[in-house]
Amino acid sequence: MGHGTNRVEDMASPNNGTAGETVVEIHSVCLPPKKTAFQKLKKRVGDVFFPDDPLQRFRNQTWRNRVILGLQSLFPIFTWGSQYDLKLLRSDVISGLTIASLAIPQGISYAKLANLPPIVGLYSSFVPPLIYAVLGSSRHLAVGPVSIASLVMGSMLSESVSPTQDSILYLKLAFTSTFFAGVFQASLGLLRLGFMIDFLSKATLIGFTAGAAVIVSLQQLKGLLGIVHFTGKMQIVPVMSSVFNHRSEWSWETIVMGIGFLSILLTTRHISMRKPKLFWISAASPLASVIISTLLVYLIRSKTHAISFIGHLPKGLNPPSLNMLYFSGAHLALAIKTGIITGILSLTEGIAVGRTFASLKNYQVNGNKEMMAIGFMNMAGSCTSCYVTTGSFSRSAVNYNAGAKTAVSNIVMASAVLVTLLFLMPLFYYTPNVILAAIILTAVIGLIDYQAAYKLWKVDKFDFFTCLCSFFGVLFVSVPLGLAIAVAVSVIKILLHVTRPNTSEFGNIPGTQIYQSLGRYREASRIPGFLILAIESPIYFANSTYLQDRILRWAREEENRIKENNGTTLKCIILDMTAVSAIDTSGLEAVFELRRRLEKQSLQLVLVNPVGTVMEKLHKSKIIEALGLSGLYLTVGEAVADLSSTWKANGQP
């Protein structure tokens, strides 16, 4: 601004109407420091892709220290490995063995949920945890198969390929999907594109996980009721139809055993939730249930054949599966699509779980490192007969409560799984399928977070609607389409916020120089002759026309209000641009056009406090020159005071 910085004026106060000599200090609105196009681009790229400034720790370091810091950055195990001692090892061994007791039955159960051989679930609880222990930055994340990713993979692949009639092709697609999931996850981390997963909003995930939990629970009726011929579809209607259409296959022995062990598992879960110190009861109950139920089936095997069991599981380490990866053929697109969707879901869950427990212990989990760790873990897993894995909330909670100190607990868990694979597999021969169904039911029931849904209803109705779209989409359409519907609704919400931003009318709070929304503050009052508006978003091509029309409507409504109340003629419209973080050429054109149209109505347009980049573009586009000497101010208070004194000096009412 070109006008002076201090004036003494004889003016009327906008608050009480009394006249007096008041010092009005008018501050200039400055342009930001000049920068080259390259400097601007460099800063913008840094803000978008490197908000955490990962190279900061390397500055002012010797080459030797930089190499050490680089190794610690790539392999977090070097950060805490040098300080590892027997005390930490004891805690990690206890927690590792504890989560192993949960991981073994869950691994077998979740593999069946993905329509894969049970042994694949154990393979997936061996190799991935070892890789995560080296690459992961979370101390408490317990890695392995999870219910949601297993369900999504099973439902998407089985729509095109039968897991029973074409089991080899199905297995190939599962491993290939895992490979592409890993590539996608690692790429997000390497390219620092983690913000892409933010399109899965909290509301979307609440509805999706709840809907998936219901579908998973209903699918377990096959095992709980002893049904042999069951639908492979995942929607609620065909699942329930299959349950009642095959009533003749219901087995009372299976039902009794299922209800009994399900009651035990739910009771131990409830006890552990009420008294966290008794976490070990809930952690040990799945394995204990597997052992007891296996013994029961073994003892009564000659008296009844109604209870189905797992059967033979091969002993030995993970066989290599690199030769089974499917990189050409009719189903490649299906493998890629399944990999991306399961990759996004597992990545979202893993990072969320890791950050949850990191916040409890006051340390930080690096999101990009986690993406790379989980991605490389799944890529390696796909070559060693594993399917999609990530951090499990239930296992991580047990790991945390058991006193885990570092990622060594994952190594201990993997070692326990290794012993199981090498020596204990024949013991699972008579493990009944009904106990696996009960374990899955107990695990997924906690995914139905009705309290979070109620909070959405109380806080944000649109988020609640998104949650419902996700929930019912999964239940009645399909798992991937339900997720897609919810993401589409979330994107529509973003578009609405961008294309139809909020504008509000400001007034003065008496006795102060504070201007706030008339709708929020009842004591705020209008200033005669002024219409003060605040724009609460960037001005882009998508909303520039809307904002122009909305501001002109504000002006018409204000003039009509003045006529009805015989008030002071409207002379000036002030736009508070404090919240306008950016503007493009369409926005600049809209501001210029708005000034021209208001000028025809004998109304002055004044801009207040544009931020640096906006101010720079206003200056370069000559809009500042067009607005004139009194068209730009630092605060609303200064604008009102200066313009009022100018009008009074010119004899205007």
Curated annotation (Swiss-Prot):
It is found in: Membrane. One of its GO terms (biological process) is phosphate ion transport. Keywords: Membrane, Sulfate transport, Symport, Transmembrane, Transmembrane helix, Transport. The keyword Transmembrane helix applies. Pfam families: STAS, Sulfate_transp. Residues 114-115, 162-167, 216-247, 301-331, 392-407, 455-471 are extracellular. GO terms for cellular component: plasma membrane; plasmodesma. The keyword Iron-sulfur does not apply. Residues 1-92, 137-140, 189-194, 269-279, 353-370, 429-433, 493-653 are cytoplasmic. It is a multi-pass membrane protein. The chain crosses the membrane at residues 93-113, 116-136, 141-161, 168-188, 195-215, 248-268, 280-300, 332-352, 371-391, 408-428, 434-454, 472-492. Residues 520-643 form the STAS domain. GO terms for molecular function: secondary active sulfate transmembrane transporter activity; symporter activity. PROSITE patterns: SLC26A, STAS. H(+)/sulfate cotransporter that may play a role in the regulation of sulfate assimilation. Belongs to the SLC26A/SulP transporter (TC 2.A.53) family. This is Probable sulfate transporter 3.4.
